[in-house]
Design a protein with these regions (language model features):
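Membrane/wall-proximal cationic-aromatic binding patches
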Residues: 29-118, 251, 264, 349, ...
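Conserved SGNH/GDSL esterase-like catalytic core that processes O-acyl groups on lipids
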Residues: 90-91, 99-187
Length: 376
């Protein structure tokens, strides 16, 4: 009995000592704890609201790179020019490739400037809704949000589908989808993501609420330490359950880390089942667009990555799949959609020097080459 009491007391005392050490360490390093916290309750609440439906929206830090003074809705979409009195509204959708129009990483706004020059000649309004890692399922839902929440009814949609979208659909979004009467109504964010990721906002939300709502440094430290304990314990408990107890395919899939290598694996070693699933998400997106009576025309744009060029295969790793080919196959049954296939154009251009057209990731075009797509 005494041994049991001694062990319990020692355990609790150890926990208390650890807590006190963590408290003082956190207190004296408090300024470093909130580097990624939201800067305002307005952006925090906006981000939480729409991420519940469409998994994630733009990071608050991206607003620092916008070509104009940002508004909170720029977390979801950016109005390139005023829509008032315009005869046509053009909506750009897609991932960071399309986001690059208004958020270039090198502060070179060539694409945005070319779009603006065009709108000065025509009565056309442009909206850029491109967001990092947006693929057809998320774009599908984004259309509803823009229409229902912001009364944006585009006449023309230019949708970019990236080579990485097949990986995003199969790894990030597949098991987070919510359907109602066979209609996709949301892609839920992972509340306790099992790995560090750009879209692990559940922890950032908690930190931001403490940062923005609590002014007293001692209370802020107390709440922060408690939050970290609770979040860490819950995350560890979920991980243990999924790894050792659950037999659910969904639980097992959520242990997978959707890092770059996993996302790109579909291009290196494509599987028929994953290609079919991805094709189905594209068909679902096209079906959604076709249901929008205000949409007159849709263009789907695809482009290669550097590894699609034979001479650029690195360390024996080559891409066996090109998403552009999947789009071509699908659109044989959808003649009302136009595919702008830059894979076909660029890969067959013997005069192209493709060494100088990329950003460091070898997936995105640099701003100078990116601007070529908006010249005509």
């Amino acid at each position: 009995m005494k041994n049991s009491y001694l062990i319990t007391t020692s355990f609790l005392l150890t926990i208390l000592i650890i807590y006190i050490i963590l408290f003082f360490y956190t207190f004296f390093n408090l300024n470093n704890e909130f580097n990624y916290a939201f800067k305002s309750l307005e952006t925090l609440n906006f981000h939480k609201k729409y991420s519940k439906k469409i998994h994630h929206i733009r990071d608050e830090s991206s607003l620092d790179f916008l070509f104009k003074n940002p508004k909170v809705e720029d977390l979801l979409f950016t109005t390139i020019n005023s829509l008032d009195g315009k005869e046509k509204i053009v909506l750009f959708q897609g991932d960071s490739w399309m986001e690059q129009i208004t958020f270039p990483v090198d502060d070179n706004f060539i694409s945005a400037e070319l779009v603006q020059k065009f709108k000065n000649k025509k009565k056309v309004g442009f909206i850029n809704a491109g967001t990092s890692s947006y693929s057809p399922s998320i774009m599908n839902l984004q259309l509803d949000v823009l229409e229902e929440e912001f009364q944006i009814f585009p006449n023309i949609i230019i949708a970019y589908i990236d080579q990485t979208d097949i990986g995003d659909e199969n790894c990030r979004y597949k098991y987070n989808k919510i359907y109602e009467n066979d209609v996709l109504i949301s892609v839920q964010p992972e509340l306790h993501l099992m790995y560090k990721d750009l879209f692990n906002y559940s922890q950032i939300y908690g930190l931001s609420e403490i940062f923005l709502n609590e002014k007293n440094k001692i209370l802020k430290t107390f709440k922060l330490v408690n939050f970290k304990f609770k979040y860490g314990l819950k995350k560890s408990g979920i991980r243990f359950f999924r790894k050792y107890i659950s037999r659910s395919e969904i639980d097992k899939s959520r242990l997978k880390k959707c890092y770059g290598e996993e996302i790109l694996s579909n291009l290196v070693n494509p599987k028929d089942s994953e290609i079919k699933y991805f094709a189905d998400t594209i068909k679902e997106y096209i079906k959604k667009v076709n249901q929008k009576k205000h949409v007159e025309k849709i263009f789907i744009v695809t482009a290669p990555h550097k590894k699609h060029f034979d001479k650029n295969f690195i360390e024996g790793i080559s891409y066996k799949l090109n998403v552009s080919d999947i789009i071509d196959s699908i659109l044989q049954e959808n003649k009302n959609v136009t595919h702008i296939n830059f894979s076909k154009i660029l890969l067959n251009n013997d005069n192209l020097n493709n060494e100088d057209i990329w950003l460091d990731d070898n997936m995105h075009f640099n701003s100078n080459f990116h601007g070529n797509f908006f010249i005509k």
